[in-house]
Amino acid sequence: MTDKTSLSYKDAGVDIDAGNALVDRIKGVVKQTKRPEVMGGLGGFGALCALPQKYREPILVSGTDGVGTKLRLAMDLKRHDTIGIDLVAMCVNDLVVQGAEPLFFLDYYATGKLDVDTAAAVITGIAEGCKQSGCALVGGETAEMPGMYHGEDYDVAGFCVGVVEKADIIDGSKVQAGDTLLALAASGPHSNGYSLVRKILSFSQTDPEQTQVEGKSLADHLLAPTCIYVKALLSLIAQTEVHAIAHLTGGGFWENIPRVLPAGTQAVIDKNSWQWPAVFRWLQQAGNVSRHEMYRTFNCGVGMVIAVPADSTAKALAILADLGETAWVLGQIHPADGEHQVIIR
């Protein structure tokens, strides 16, 4: 071999300088998320975090998630500023349903070719989600992998750790017949069902930017960031008895509510207790989707389902209203009368 060409990592498609520029861009917003328990800053091999001193028997709760194919829609529409909020929401909402306070968050951002502006927008959204949920963004990984992703396409994943007092873990074991089921309103489809969303858009030949649904573009409805319920739910838990909380994600009503129901109980939901938001009505009509499939794929406007003792219903609704949440009585827990743990009627 006689060619004396000297190859570099950049020639292979990995731009270390771009990665360093990204770190410089995000330092400020990441710093805004710091909690007093966090030791050190960005740049270490690992992040250090002490447990809050208020806990007597602290139990760590962890979770990891992504945003699914909502990312594809965001990339197609070149809207990257709220995807990071979605990522945090999917993780921290899974923690808080067990009564846990999120402590810290880490992200993974992978792409074929690093676009600093896009990555900075995504990570700024992650920092915003961390601020909304009160957890610290303590680190992450930015992986530029030419040949693994097409061009500047990217994927994100998140990992979160929280803490709960052992005696205060919410696991559904206290749920009993007669409990009231409350709903917390969703901002839209959140981060689930987007493969079906994209199929409906293709099937109906719809341009989401040009299609108006109740005064705003369909794109705005579909890319609305996932609600982060952490502060509202922690406040509710601190003020009244809560028996269970279900985060309506993939699998919708049929699969998520049973995860917090003990044997011998059944959730009976009143379908007339709320009207589906316009975006779900549009999706159902445009895709000719059955109601059963809608309930299985989407949250249909319900982000969280909360089981409380019947005599705590009014108090819980008042607390949630004071916190600015839209909440209502969704149904009730009944003794199980068959194989189905969720009945919508």
UniProtKB/Swiss-Prot annotation:
Q: Which UniProt keywords apply?
A: ATP-binding, Cytoplasm, Ligase, Nucleotide-binding, Purine biosynthesis
Q: Supply the InterPro entries for this chain.
A: PurM-like_C_dom, PurM-like_C_sf, PurM-like_N, PurM-like_N_sf, PurM_cligase
Which reaction(s) does the protein catalyse, per the Swiss-Prot or TrEMBL entry? 2-formamido-N(1)-(5-O-phospho-beta-D-ribosyl)acetamidine + ATP = 5-amino-1-(5-phospho-beta-D-ribosyl)imidazole + ADP + phosphate + H(+)
**For this protein, what is the EC number?**
6.3.3.1
EC top class, in one word? Answer: ligase
Under which pathway is this protein filed?
Answer: Purine metabolism; IMP biosynthesis via de novo pathway; 5-amino-1-(5-phospho-D-ribosyl)imidazole from N(2)-formyl-N(1)-(5-phospho-D-ribosyl)glycinamide: step 2/2
Compartments it resides in: Cytoplasm
Q: Does the keyword Membrane apply?
A: no
Task: Name one cellular component (GO) term.
Answer: cytosol
Q: Name one GO biological process term.
A: 'de novo' IMP biosynthetic process
Major site of localization recorded for this protein:
cytoplasm
Tell me if ATP-binding is a UniProt keyword of this record: yes
Q: Which GO terms describe its molecular function?
A: ATP binding; phosphoribosylamine-glycine ligase activity; phosphoribosylformylglycinamidine cyclo-ligase activity
Q: Which PANTHER family match?
A: TRIFUNCTIONAL PURINE BIOSYNTHETIC PROTEIN ADENOSINE-3 (PTHR10520:SF12), TRIFUNCTIONAL PURINE BIOSYNTHETIC PROTEIN ADENOSINE-3-RELATED (PTHR10520)
Instruction: Cite the NCBIfam families for this sequence.
Output: purM
Q: Which family does it belong to?
A: Belongs to the AIR synthase family.
Which HAMAP family does the record match to this protein?
AIRS
Name of this protein: Phosphoribosylformylglycinamidine cyclo-ligase
The source organism is Sodalis glossinidius (strain morsitans)
Tell me the gene name: purM
